[in-house]
A protein has these predicted regions:
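Outer membrane beta-barrel
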Residues: 1-128, 142-149, 153-160, 200-204, ...
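Outer-membrane beta-barrel translocator domains and adjoining extracellular loop/strand segments
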Residues: 50-55, 83-91, 128-140, 144, ...
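Detector for outer-membrane/organellar transmembrane beta-barrel domains
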Residues: 156-228
Length: 228
């Protein structure tokens, strides 16, 4: 509020962007042994940071499908981004703590009737960890350990339940500055274990069906840090 008690934010604004216009292609490839192959490429013009109107890769992967099991190599949604997410008109994600991220990964999935098991090794590309030097790939690159994810999901009709856990191990720095600006080599690591819980319950009300769900919860908490 200003000195007269008026809302300083009560000013309308409007815009029209083409940043999220998408170009993509889906290809069904030939069989490799007993596996069906498919490829997906998708891009928009969001760029990164403040560099707007620049081509950005959203999805770029190859998938090998053996029926019950499948192997994906490339960039797609982070495994912590679950199947339960609000439908919104805006571009902002409407779920708190939703890990809205696409990342390069090697992902294996096994499906048996209503159950699905997922394991993945994930790297960082567009969505980066925050550290002493700001957002950077260096923390996970110097760690030499990718993000490791395992999870299980159950689906029966509209009912969907899932749980997953990830290990993220980073090296925030390899040197420190002491007295008289002397530099010292340090060996520090911080390890975090984000978790995901999802639940989607369809409830019929009259002739319509309403979906009531517990939104995905993902929170990265440091479990331990080691330094020498």
């Amino acid at each position: 509020l200003d000195a007269d008690g008026k809302d300083l934010n009560a000013s309308p604004n409007g815009s029209f962007y083409l940043l999220y216009s998408r170009l993509g292609i889906d290809v069904q490839g030939p069989k490799v042994g007993s596996a069906k192959t498919s490829l997906k490429l998708e891009a928009d013009f969001r760029g990164s940071g403040s560099n707007w109107a620049v081509l950005r890769i959203r999805h770029a992967y190859v998938n090998l499908d053996w029926g019950k099991s499948a192997l994906l190599l490339g960039q797609t949604w982070h495994p912590l981004f679950g199947n339960v997410s609000p439908q919104i008109l805006n571009l902002s994600v409407g779920a708190p703590f939703q890990p809205f991220s696409r990342a390069p990964q090697i992902r294996y999935r096994y499906t048996e009737k209503n159950f699905q098991l997922t394991g993945a090794a994930v790297w960082q590309s567009q969505y980066l960890s925050q550290g002493p030097a700001g957002k950077s790939q260096e923390y996970i690159k110097k760690s030499c350990i990718p993000e490791i994810y395992i999870g299980a999901d159950y689906k029966n009709g509209g009912l969907l339940a899932g749980v997953g856990i990830e290990m993220l191990s980073l090296k925030p720095r390899t040197e420190a500055t002491g007295e008289n600006n002397k530099k010292f080599q340090v060996d520090e690591r911080i390890t975090l274990f984000p978790m995901k819980l999802t639940l989607n319950i369809p409830i019929k009300t009259g002739s319509s069906e309403q979906k009531v769900f517990w939104v995905p919860i993902s929170h990265r908490l440091p479990v331990w840090a080691d330094s020498e």
